[in-house]
Swiss-Prot record:
Belongs to the ATPase gamma chain family. F-type ATPases have 2 components, CF(1) - the catalytic core - and CF(0) - the membrane proton channel. CF(1) has five subunits: alpha(3), beta(3), gamma(1), delta(1), epsilon(1). CF(0) has three main subunits: a, b and c. This is ATP synthase gamma chain. NCBIfam families: ATPsyn_F1gamma, PRK13425.1. It comes from the Bacteria. It is found in: Cell membrane. Produces ATP from ADP in the presence of a proton gradient across the membrane. The gamma chain is believed to be important in regulating ATPase activity and the flow of protons through the CF(0) complex. InterPro entries: ATP_synth_F1_ATPase_gsu (IPR035968), ATP_synth_F1_gsu (IPR000131), ATP_synth_F1_gsu_CS (IPR023632). The gene is atpG. Disulfide bonds: none annotated. It comes from Prosthecochloris aestuarii (strain DSM 271 / SK 413). Its main location: membrane. GO terms for cellular component: plasma membrane; proton-transporting ATP synthase complex.
Length: 292
């Protein structure tokens, strides 16, 4: 049975941990507000670019732009995985890593077995996980979320599009956490290349007049679209990470509160037992003296 000193030490340790988790929850909440604003602000711009591509694709021969044309056969796949740099965010990284593994080993099982699935990791957790295993990592970006910058998203998009244009890969998939709410992260795997513009059916393209020509505009718009989509996904992941950390720290704080309650009960019981034992010894000693 634990002594009073042991229980006091545990209570002190749990209180210290509770203070840390409570502070981390407050920090995550502040970061979440900023990250959520950035993610929400990026969505309309990304959506409008996609809408414009849908309109343009009805006015030009999409086969003239390789990034708008799906390959007849997919012989090699590039997976871009976005995770966090830090832990203490629940199952945030574990769940998205599982999705990435499924994309590589299940959705593209034959290509994976033949070593034709490449990987780019943005974030330390995904990079650290896959570099210790049998996966082909082309590039890692550990620490990218410590100072999140558009230039990294642009670099990833340019590398992916360059590989696609050179025929080094036939498909690019991005795996990331999309921010929905604090309690409902959305695990996503989106095809970045080839681009499938929304609204490219019979009704697309009637609302815009393009100058100088749709063909010249689409060549400029496609790279902007790719850069923006990768940036949006990184912003979404950052917001989802802060939400997951806030929820995890809130849960840890509540668990610490419950553990303190149980430890206090144990402490009081142990203290009561010690007092009872001392009283019994005193009474027994007094009775022994009276009997002599």
């Amino acid at each position: 049975m634990a002594t009073l000193k042991d229980i006091r030490t545990r209570i002190k340790g749990v209180k210290s941990t509770q203070q840390v988790t409570k502070a981390m929850k407050m920090v995550a909440a502040a970061k979440l507000r900023r990250a959520q604003e950035s993610a929400v602000q990026a969505r309309p711009y990304a959506a409008k670019l996609k809408e414009m591509l849908g309109s343009l694709s009805t006015k030009v021969d999409t086969s003239l732009n390789p990034m708008l044309s799906a390959r007849d056969e997919v012989g090699r796949v590039l997976v871009v995985l976005i995770t966090s740099d830090r832990g203490l965010c629940g199952a945030f990284n574990t769940n998205i890593i599982k999705v990435a593994q499924k994309v590589m080993t299940v959705d593209h099982a034959d290509l994976h077995k033949s070593g034709k699935v490449d990987l780019i990791c943005a974030g330390s957790k995904g990079y650290d996980f896959f570099r210790k295993r049998d996966y082909r990592i082309l590039k890692g970006y550990p620490g990218v979320f410590q100072n999140l910058d558009f230039s990294v998203a642009k670099e990833i998009a340019e590398q992916a599009s360059g590989m696609y244009l050179r025929g080094e890969v036939d498909k690019v998939v991005v795996v990331y956490n999309e921010f929905k709410s604090v309690l409902a992260p959305n695990l996503k795997s989106e095809v970045l290349l080839p681009i499938t513009p929304e609204g490219s059916g019979d009704e697309g393209g009637s609302d815009y007049i393009y100058e100088p020509s749709p063909a010249s505009i689409i060549d400029v718009l496609v790279p902007k679209h790719l850069n923006t989509q990768v940036w949006r996904m990184m912003l979404e992941s950052n917001a989802a990470e802060q939400a997951a950390r806030m929820a995890a720290m809130d849960s840890a704080t509540e668990n610490a509160k419950e553990l303190l309650r149980l430890l206090n009960i144990s402490y009081n019981r142990a203290r009561q037992a010690a007092i009872t034992t001392e009283l019994s010894e005193i009474v027994a000693g007094a009775e022994a003296l009276q009997g002599t």
